[in-house]
């Protein structure tokens, strides 16, 4: 069974940077050693946003974007190696999620697409890469997402305490770690995605730092109720979603009914939408004693306060409080999934994704010996 140093690479739906994590992994433990966040050039970020919202590209443009992202991921890995004074031979493998540009797990031909050419990463780092983690689960009738609940269960499950792990990235997803029950998990809906999109369009800021804009506004209840009527929120699990659904166009369609509103009030309403949709799903899933939050949203004081208010009797904390960096959780999970793939172990949970069976995930891109 392969064990040693692994690197995880994650570029999520928030597009706030490439997260790279170094960890030692074996069958008994996962120990994080180092991490860094690598910037995504504005032009590349915009190209990804455009394709996620349905802008058509030529095959040549699509191929160039795939190559550029692969090179970006390789640069991020090499920066971490240099920082830690490590060589390619010191690393067993890289687990690279890739950049999701489309996720449509239901319909006539279910599919998901993550890009960022893994061959570029191998060529530029000299390290074996495991990638393309989601499509095997979809081929077996699953959603292909979320995949991180398996990792949450391995690290954070408790024999008697009802726990849930909440990742608030661009999309928010919940892992249900309930003693005596199969692991559960699904996407609750938008996390930071709509809040980030709104403040970017209105104020040119990548995100609402410390929720300053949202705190200065007031929740527009009719707008909130209008958004909450979206059928995704009442859809039963298993379910997953992404930027191809909850994007700026989705927000604009709801705002048409509310002309002339204060932009800060919209920001406050979007924060409340995220908090309400998460808390409703926590309660519908039977509630928990402890909700451990990770991802960028864990640093949003308004979101954290609203979750605590909407979930009385639940201890709302961060994964940092139990020794796991909330910023690095997803990248760490894909390092762990790469270890499982190389060990020939399944990486999905049918109780979460709805797949017909457990399966080894991903494709292996071996480095030269």
Swiss-Prot record:
SUPFAM superfamilies: Actin-like ATPase domain (SSF53067). Signal peptide: none annotated. Its EC number is 2.7.1.170. Pathway: Amino-sugar metabolism; 1,6-anhydro-N-acetylmuramate degradation; Cell wall biogenesis; peptidoglycan recycling. It holds the Pfam family AnmK. One of its GO terms (biological process) is 1,6-anhydro-N-acetyl-beta-muramic acid catabolic process. It catalyses: 1,6-anhydro-N-acetyl-beta-muramate + ATP + H2O = N-acetyl-D-muramate 6-phosphate + ADP + H(+). GO terms for molecular function: ATP binding; kinase activity; phosphotransferase activity, alcohol group as acceptor. Keywords: ATP-binding, Carbohydrate metabolism, Kinase, Nucleotide-binding, Transferase. PANTHER family: ANHYDRO-N-ACETYLMURAMIC ACID KINASE. Catalyzes the specific phosphorylation of 1,6-anhydro-N-acetylmuramic acid (anhMurNAc) with the simultaneous cleavage of the 1,6-anhydro ring, generating MurNAc-6-P. Is required for the utilization of anhMurNAc either imported from the medium or derived from its own cell wall murein, and thus plays a role in cell wall recycling. Belongs to the anhydro-N-acetylmuramic acid kinase family. This is Anhydro-N-acetylmuramic acid kinase. It comes from Escherichia coli (strain 55989 / EAEC). The lineage of its organism: Bacteria, Pseudomonadati, Pseudomonadota, Gammaproteobacteria, Enterobacterales. The gene is anmK.
């Amino acid at each position: 069974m392969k064990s040693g140093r692994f690197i995880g690479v994650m570029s999520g739906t928030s597009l706030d940077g490439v997260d790279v994590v170094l960890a030692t992994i074996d069958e008994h433990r996962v120990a994080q050693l180092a991490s860094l966040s690598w910037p995504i050039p504005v032009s590349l970020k915009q190209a990804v946003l455009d394709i996620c919202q349905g802008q058509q590209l030529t095959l040549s443009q699509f191929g160039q974007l795939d190559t550029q992202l692969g090179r970006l991921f390789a640069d991020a890995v090499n920066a971490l190696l240099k920082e830690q004074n490590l060589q390619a031979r010191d690393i067993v493998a890289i687990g690279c999620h890739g950049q999701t540009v489309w996720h449509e797990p239901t319909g006539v031909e279910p599919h998901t697409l993550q890009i960022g050419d893994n061959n570029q990463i191998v060529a530029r780092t000299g390290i074996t890469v495991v990638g393309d983690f989601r499509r095997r689960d979809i081929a077996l009738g699953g959603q292909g997402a979320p995949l991180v609940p398996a990792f949450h269960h391995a690290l954070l499950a408790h024999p008697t305490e009802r726990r849930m792990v909440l990742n608030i990235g661009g999309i928010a997803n919940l892992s249900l770690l309930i003693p005596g029950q199969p692991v559960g998990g699904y996407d609750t809906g938008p996390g930071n995605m709509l809040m980030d999109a709104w403040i970017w369009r209105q104020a040119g800021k990548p995100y609402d730092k410390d929720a300053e804009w949202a705190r200065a506004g007031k929740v527009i209840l009719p707008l909130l109720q209008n958004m909450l009527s979206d059928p995704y929120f009442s859809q039963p699990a298993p379910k997953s979603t992404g930027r191809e659904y909850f994007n700026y166009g989705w927000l604009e369609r709801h705002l048409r009914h509310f002309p002339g509103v204060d932009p800060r009030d919209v920001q406050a309403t979007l924060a409340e939408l995220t908090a309400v949709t998460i808390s409703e799903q926590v309660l519908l899933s039977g509630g928990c004693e402890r909700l451990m939050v990770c991802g960028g949203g864990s640093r949003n004081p308004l979101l954290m306060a609203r979750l605590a208010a909407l979930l009385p009797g639940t201890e709302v904390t961060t994964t940092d409080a139990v020794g796991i960096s909330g910023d690095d959780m997803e990248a760490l999970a894909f390092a762990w999934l790469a270890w499982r793939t190389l060990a020939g172990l399944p990486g999905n949970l049918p109780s979460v994704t709805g797949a017909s069976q457990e399966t080894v995930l991903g494709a292996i891109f071996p480095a030269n010996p």
